Regions:
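Insoluble glucan recognition modules
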Residues: 1-227
């Protein structure tokens, strides 16, 4: 890099990448430059909100793969910006999208969905979330699920239940393919849940209103209110 008189760095990177990620290691004074061609977020908008609210899908790895979880009902589209329609993506055949001025995505039956978009190959998928449940020693054992019910008014998956002192996680469709626990290996981190190897959540014995809010990585949380 070029180092200025004030100690600042200037790095010139060839190419036409949309974004640049620079990682600096101050222990050994090295740096790494990564060219990134995808934004961190894209957005879904559709009939479920009267086409008025954009729902964020997050791409944590900047590889063009985005995911989010939302209540859906009817037709919808994807777009790169929350506040305008520039460059929005439409239906381009089953499971495919394109910026072609085409029609909306086919309507979905009302329900809560896992939405996946891959801009690298211009595909998408909407997977119905049939259930989200509590499982763990706090729930009796790791073989028994207690189902939550989605509440459209609060935007949360909810249940009032009695829990033992112990550990628990939340999982989708009674399966371990997708589950949520505490981010950063922290079992007390109720305010930031991850589906990427989340820690078992620690819970004290009691009866609680459990409210689980699932949107995307960095925006998932659970609120336990003692009853």
């Amino acid at each position: 890099p070029e180092i200025g008189d004030d100690g600042s760095w200037k790095v010139v990177v060839a190419g036409d990448a949309k974004l640049i990620r620079m990682t600096i290691n101050m222990m050994d004074y090295t740096y790494q430059i990564e060219k990134i061609n995808f934004n961190e977020y894209i957005y879904e908008i559709g009939n479920e909100s009267g086409w008025s609210t954009a729902h964020a899908l997050r791409g944590l790895n900047f590889d063009g793969k985005y995911q989010g979880y939302y209540w859906m009902d009817g037709e919808y589209k994807f777009k790169p910006n929350a506040d305008n329609w520039d460059g929005d993506w439409e239906n381009d055949g089953e499971g495919k999208i394109a910026d072609n001025g085409g029609s909306n995505m086919p309507g979905l039956a009302a329900g809560f969905y896992q939405i996946d978009v891959n801009l690298a190959d211009m595909t998408y998928a909407a997977t119905l979330v049939e259930s989200i449940s509590i499982i763990g020693s706090a729930n009796g054992n790791w073989d028994t699920d207690t189902d939550l019910t989605y509440n459209q008014a609060t935007g949360a998956w909810e249940v009032t239940t009695t829990l033992n002192a112990g550990e628990m996680k939340f999982r989708m469709n009674h399966d371990w393919a997708i589950s949520w626990g505490g981010a950063n290996g922290d079992g007390t981190n109720y305010g930031d849940l991850t589906q990427n190897n989340g820690a078992n959540l620690q819970v004290a014995a009691g009866t609680y209103l459990v409210q689980l809010y699932i949107q995307h990585e960095g925006a998932n949380k659970v609120v336990l209110t003692a009853q």
